[in-house]
């Protein structure tokens, strides 16, 4: 009898340990290289930490699709959810319910309102990323009165709109003669993005630059320029090196930026694992991530938020990268 009780206790402890270490990593949508790379980093970190990481997302970027996944993961007993939010507030009711049930909620890539999560794994502040967009463009645009188009995913997505707001403010301050002729959206759809990019180039034959801080919009703008045989347009923005490599090699794109999204996925899972094992992280605390280093929890104010609370903050990626013909082959994601 005593032996049976010992075996039963050991079995229950193993089951409990397995159930306590399940992390859901949710992109805006599946089938996009940027998000797949982030998911790969998340799963690599899970394997190294001995936790079970599930990567899944909607087939189209929608609040309802993400909410359904969040609810499913909560009902299945997952202990942490890390989501790239398609809306700053649309996911909040589902995420708040998850937190009430003891689930650790984090965001990565695109944030919710800060009160709807604990930690945001942030690729850069709006000032850093908006500034980088303008810096890449100004190095290629020689006209004092340049005509510029902005082209990205949607008018509601959190991260890209913050970057574009800062980029436009920088242009107004530092390049007051530049004219922003249009701001258009591809809605995370490759076909629509290509059609929209071609439409922009046709509508503005004297366009000097397209600024496209979106993983679908940037390659679409480059492909549109090639399809229409348009030269002399500076095409800059954010996407992954594997997607952009052919356009860089052909000279259609001279430079574009991003951050190491594989590292972002790894950092997110490491932070979630730290929350599960040791509890809240507060502003000023640090997290050690193997092969990356020590990362400090920053206040939400670095993202321009007014909300601060215990166990709530932002972990910034240590660096951003500008890719060009000289360095693009050093990266594979």
From Swiss-Prot:
GO terms for cellular component: ATP-binding cassette (ABC) transporter complex; outer membrane-bounded periplasmic space. Residues 1-19 form the signal peptide. Gene3D superfamilies: 3.40.50.2300. Keywords: Periplasm, Signal. One of its GO terms (molecular function) is carbohydrate binding. InterPro entries: Bact_Solute-Bind_Prot2, LsrB, Peripla_BP_I, SBP_2_dom. It is found in: Periplasm. Its main location: periplasm. It holds the Pfam family Peripla_BP_4. The complex is composed of two ATP-binding proteins (LsrA), two transmembrane proteins (LsrC and LsrD) and a solute-binding protein (LsrB). Part of the ABC transporter complex LsrABCD involved in autoinducer 2 (AI-2) import. Binds AI-2 and delivers it to the LsrC and LsrD permeases. Belongs to the bacterial solute-binding protein 2 family. PANTHER family: ABC TRANSPORTER PERIPLASMIC-BINDING PROTEIN YPHF, D-XYLOSE-BINDING PERIPLASMIC PROTEIN. This is Autoinducer 2-binding protein LsrB. It comes from Klebsiella pneumoniae subsp. pneumoniae (strain ATCC 700721 / MGH 78578).
